[in-house]
Design a protein with these regions (language model features):
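Terminal, non-catalytic domain-edge segments
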Residues: 8-74, 81-83, 90, 95, ...
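Hydrophobic core segments within long, regular secondary-structure runs in both alpha-
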Residues: 40-51, 90, 104-122, 145, ...
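Extended ligand-binding groove/face enriched in aromatic
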Residues: 101-247, 254, 293-296
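Charged/polar, low-hydrophobicity segments characteristic of intrinsically disordered regions
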Residues: 119-142, 232-242, 283-310, 346-355, ...
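Extended ligand-binding clefts on enzyme/binding-domain cores
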Residues: 214-225, 236-359
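C-terminal outer-membrane/trafficking sorting elements
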Residues: 558-562, 566-582
Length: 582
């Protein structure tokens, strides 16, 4: 080899040694340019509040009662149960985990608290206390009858929200999961458990757990047996399993389908096909279309015993669209666009009016952001700023939430949780969580040991292109500002390759703890770290933490007939879908 060739080889070797450093400094520029995803201050404030809410012990058993910050008041009679606060509070946590995939310990901790509470007496309160027909069904007020009761069944029909456990043909069923009905309990439980697994990276609920039943009984399940049971029920009932006895809610089934979607993505199964078959089978019965194919009405609930669809105008479809977006984006967007047009939200010359409560608008705002509908999003966002009463509260103003001018001590749980959906992530984030979940994060460098909420994490992101972990920390703990603390980074390919910058300067105050982990000194302050780890995710995620068994579901090409009875209600008085007027 000539001297020139030797020089060329030496230069190439030299540049190879410089490449990681060049990538590292280039990555700092990318960090400052805003490419790295980040949680905003409101999201961190809400996260801090959820952390306090979930980690404060309370008693959801037969002998206790949830603390008053758990929402048991919103949207009676159908949603005024504490378990709906558990489910609604989980959604934004999944989005947060995708913004900071390298830091998940607090999300997992909160979701564990939500899951544990969902197994209790108070989570299944309606199923465990509402036996037989509603003794007050002869005394419903007129506005209640107009909204909820089929015209030909007045005086002999139970209102939505009354589960009627024990009526024929099902009889008394003590197990809230094993029951033929109670879909809204088991469907949302699986969804929350999936989000917990998605943040923790372990098959936690694959181990047996106990769920509270009638008369202090307990029933043993795993998440996998729950999903198998739910899927079997759905296959056997093409209209969908019911929530209250006799009532099938497409709203609840869409949420249950979302849980199956994420379950399949994590565990590599095929249970979600029942959702698509259900949509196609029931579309002609549950939705009303005019001769040109335009949407005229959408379902509230369906009673297969009397073949009755209880329906509202197109605007009601927003409640279904929110859950359907990751599963059937085309039909979901059709429901959304029709609803926003009917409501006039896309008309800049028309004011936004919706009352007496704001849950519906929070769902619309989340959908607008998801679809990238900038006109509707900006209009609803402005309305929310004026009417949702967003504010900071608690010690050092550490917590954030929406109070909705209700003059209550805490943010109204269900509504406030939905309102936070528009604060987290970018366009398409809700769909991406379920359609393209980030599972490789479990093998990537991971931040832990953060003294949350006194020290908060706004960014924790592994950039595969430059092998760098970006971390942004902040603190609102006035009593600890600038005091020393430490954090840990695990799942490192080789700790000996580590190079660290703190706020742009080389940083050496760190040490190797064990084979694949380092400990890093920091302070309670606003700090940015760029940590070159060399991780590039060159190999596909192995799913080593999860089962890979597959199940199949036979196809169903049937289509349902029109219902014998349809009641189209004026939902202007509806506490669940307020003042839609269409």
């Amino acid at each position: 080899m000539s001297d020139g060739e030797n020089l060329f080889v030496d230069l190439m070797a030299f540049f190879q040694t410089l490449l990681p450093i060049c990538k590292f400094f280039y990555s700092i520029v990318r960090m400052s340019s805003g490419v790295i995803p980040k949680l905003n201050s409101r999201t961190l404030g809400w996260l801090s509040y959820l952390h306090k809410k979930c980690l404060t012990e309370d008693d959801w058993s037969e002998d206790g009662e949830p603390l008053d910050w758990w929402d048991k008041s919103s949207n009676p009679p159908v949603l005024s149960f504490a378990r709906f606060d558990l489910s609604e509070s989980s959604y934004a946590l999944g989005l947060m985990a995708d913004v900071t995939p390298a830091w998940r310990e607090v999300y997992s901790e909160i979701l564990n608290g939500l899951c544990e509470r969902h197994l209790t007496y108070w989570a299944a309160y309606d199923w465990l206390t509402q036996f037989g027909h509603d003794p007050d069904r002869n005394n419903y007020p007129k506005e209640w009858i107009d909204l909820w009761i089929p015209d030909h069944k007045i005086g002999e029909y139970d209102t939505p929200g009354w589960v009627a456990n024990g009526i024929e043909p099902w009889g008394l069923q003590a197990d809230p999961i094993g029951a033929d009905g109670n879909l809204f309990f088991k469907g949302w439980l699986n969804l929350i458990q999936c989000l917990h697994v998605y943040t923790k990276g372990e098959d936690t609920w694959g181990q047996p757990f106990q769920v509270a039943g009638v008369d202090r009984t307990r029933f043993e399940w795993t998440q996998h047996t729950l999903v198998s049971h739910l899927t079997s029920q759905w296959q056997e009932n093409p209209f969908g399993p019911h929530c209250e006895n006799t009532k099938i809610w497409p709203y609840c089934l869409s949420a249950a389908g979302l849980g199956l979607k994420l379950y399949d993505s994590i565990f590599h199964k095929e249970s979600h096909s029942v959702f698509h078959e259900w949509v196609e089978f029931t579309k002609g019965k549950y939705y009303g279309f005019d001769a040109s194919g335009g949407l005229e009405w959408t379902p509230i609930y369906y009673d297969p015993i009397i073949d009755h669809v209880h329906a509202a105008g197109p605007s009601n479809g927003l409640t279904i669209a929110f859950y359907m977006i990751p599963q059937d984006p085309i039909f979901a967007e059709y429901l959304y666009r029709t609803a926003t047009k009917k409501l006039g939200w896309d008309n800049t010359k028309k004011g936004i009016k919706i009352k007496p409560n704001l849950r519906f608008l929070a769902l619309g705002l989340a959908c607008a952001k998801e679809f990238g509908d900038l006109i509707v999003e900006s209009r609803l966002k402005a309305f929310a700023e004026e009417n949702f009463e967003p504010r900071w509260f608690g010690k050092d103003n550490m917590y954030f939430g929406h109070f909705f001018n209700l003059k209550e001590n805490w943010p109204r749980g269900q509504w406030a949780a939905l309102a936070m959906m528009s604060e987290v992530g970018e366009k398409g984030a809700w769909s991406n969580l379920f359609r393209n979940p980030n599972l490789e994060k479990f093998d990537a460098p991971t931040l832990s040991g953060v003294d949350f909420p006194d020290l908060m994490v706004s960014s924790a992101y592994n950039n595969k292109r430059d092998g760098t972990l970006y971390i942004a920390l902040t603190s609102q703990a006035l009593g600890k500002l600038n005091k020393r603390t430490s954090i840990k980074i695990s799942n490192l390919p080789d700790p000996n390759l580590i190079k660290i910058k703190r706020d742009g300067a080389t940083y050496d105050s760190w040490r190797i703890n064990q084979k694949n982990e380092i400990e890093l000194d920091t302070t309670y302050s606003t700090t940015n770290f760029q940590i070159y780890t060399g991780w590039s995710a060159t190999e596909a995620y192995s799913s080593r933490k999860f089962k890979t068994l597959k199940t199949s579901v036979e196809g169903n090409n049937r289509v349902s007939a029109k219902a014998s009875s349809v009641k189209l209600v004026n939902v202007s008085c509806c506490p669940c879908c307020p003042s839609l007027g269409t």
